[in-house]
């Protein structure tokens, strides 16, 4: 028999997207480790043909294994979070049946291009991750992930000197492209910028209200 939710507010669903290698899984790992003592968390990861991100999150100890579900999307990972999000909506439903009092459901998309966005039916807040190693031109390329996500994370700023990227140019371009929407620059692996991301989730998601 499925347990009923005892908390007043519904769970907050946070979508984490971005190109392959940008640091989505690392961000998710760091968020889980930093927030798990204060909030009831579950996570859903998307991969095209494997459950590699689920395995990585489990090995890292981000959350207990039963709180992490891997979804194999097949084909285009964009479709599974936007046009036909049914596979992920079903995964959310299954996780909430097991953990009805979850405060946050993290949904990590499979690596995709700059046009990827989450269906509003699937995600309440969207975080889009790009990285400095992709070049300083990435923010000005635009695309819904960069311009329309609730929070943009420009990751791996520590690599800027090694790839010839100007953080000043990236910051200026991000500010122009975002049109007032927030963005964070940092290196989530070392924890730089993580507190800002958590504060954003807590404030915009009204956690603890």
Curated annotation (Swiss-Prot):
| Main localization of the protein described in the UniProt heading | cytoplasm
Positions that bind GTP: 18-25
User: Which UniProt keywords are present, listed alphabetically?
Assistant: Chaperone, Cytoplasm, GTP-binding, Nickel insertion, Nucleotide-binding
GO molecular-function annotation terms?
A: GTP binding; GTPase activity; nickel cation binding
Gene Ontology biological process = urea catabolic process
| UniProt-annotated location(s) | Cytoplasm
Query: How does the record describe its quaternary structure?
Result: Homodimer. UreD, UreF and UreG form a complex that acts as a GTP-hydrolysis-dependent molecular chaperone, activating the urease apoprotein by helping to assemble the nickel containing metallocenter of UreC. The UreE protein probably delivers the nickel.
Q: What does this protein do?
A: Facilitates the functional incorporation of the urease nickel metallocenter. This process requires GTP hydrolysis, probably effectuated by UreG.
What name is this protein filed under?
Urease accessory protein UreG
- Record gene name: ureG
């Amino acid at each position: 028999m499925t347990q009923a939710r005892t908390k007043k507010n519904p769970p907050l669903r946070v979508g984490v997207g971005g190109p392959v290698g940008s640091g989505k899984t690392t961000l998710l790992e760091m968020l889980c480790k930093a927030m798990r003592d204060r909030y009831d968390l579950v996570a859903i990861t998307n991969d095209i043909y494997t459950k590699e991100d689920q395995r990585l999150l489990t090995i890292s100890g981000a959350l207990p294994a039963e709180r992490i579900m891997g979804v194999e999307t097949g084909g285009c990972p964009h479709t599974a979070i936007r046009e036909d999000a049914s596979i992920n909506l079903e995964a959310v439903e299954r996780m909430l049946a097991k953990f009805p009092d979850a405060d946050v459901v993290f949904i990590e998309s499979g690596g995709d291009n700059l046009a990827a966005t989450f269906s509003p039916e699937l995600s309440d807040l969207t975080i889009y991750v790009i990285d400095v190693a992709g070049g300083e031109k990435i923010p000005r390329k635009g695309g819904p992930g960069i311009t329309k996500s609730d929070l943009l994370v420009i990751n791996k700023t520590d690599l800027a000197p090694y790839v010839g990227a100007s953080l000043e140019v990236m910051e200026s371009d991000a500010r122009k492209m975002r049109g007032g929407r927030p963005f964070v620059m940092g290196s989530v692996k070392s924890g730089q910028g993580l507190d800002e991301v958590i504060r954003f989730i807590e404030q915009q998601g009204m956690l603890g209200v």
